[in-house]
Amino acid sequence: MSDRYVVLDTETSALFDFSKPADAEGQPRLAHLALIYLDSEFNVERDYDVLIKPDGWTIDAGAAAVNGLTVERLTADGIPVAEALLEYTKAIETGRVVVAFNAQFDTKVARGELRRAGMDDMFMKTRNICVMRAMTDVCQIPYTNGRAGFKFPKLAEAMAHIGEMPVTEGAHTAMVDALGALAIARWLRTNQMLPEPGVHLAKKRPDLVPTQPRRSGKAKPAAATDELPA
């Protein structure tokens, strides 16, 4: 049976600290969730786009400057995080593969909220494809500090590379970024460069899926920054 997919993007209340577990004190909260459901041929089935009502947390000024979200707007238009988590978990439980631009970030945001809610974080169930990592060797953008290798491209850089015009109006909303990730995923699939899904590895999880093979037959680590708490 062919895989079905769900494109995931999140906006958060502040910047994430990847050196800490997803649900550690001080980690940012989910503020905006976007999901785009795809069939096995990457055709859109439906989408899901919701703001999250704060339950005591606030928006960091830096995050607000990027995503335009405010506590007032989220309080007025948001839904309880529990409702959003039910939608997300249903997608994973039904076997969909998560596709995201920086899947390590978005799945960790979701994992933190699931843990706070006392739910299964679905670490082992969340098969995912990170199109940001897949585009790193495609874009080949050098580091500016002289470091060897290529840096992870920004979403706009990856879109420009494949000939897609980055959206300026509404940029950095979860749905706009999810649509960008979808465009990149389709390009990778068309060019037979879409990685096979894998489970992200994190520190203290050495027994999990060791590699995320590419369609070309080459294997790469499931994440370049695996030595981090889950």
Model regions and ranges:
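Short acidic, Gly/Ser-rich segments with clustered Asp/Glu that frequently serve as metal-coordination loops
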Residues: 10-23
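Metal-dependent phosphoesterase signature
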Residues: 64-88
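Flexible, glycine- and charge-enriched loops at secondary-structure boundaries
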Residues: 24-26, 74
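Metal-dependent phosphoesterase core characteristic of DEDDh/y 3'-5' exonuclease domains
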Residues: 2-4, 26-69, 90-230
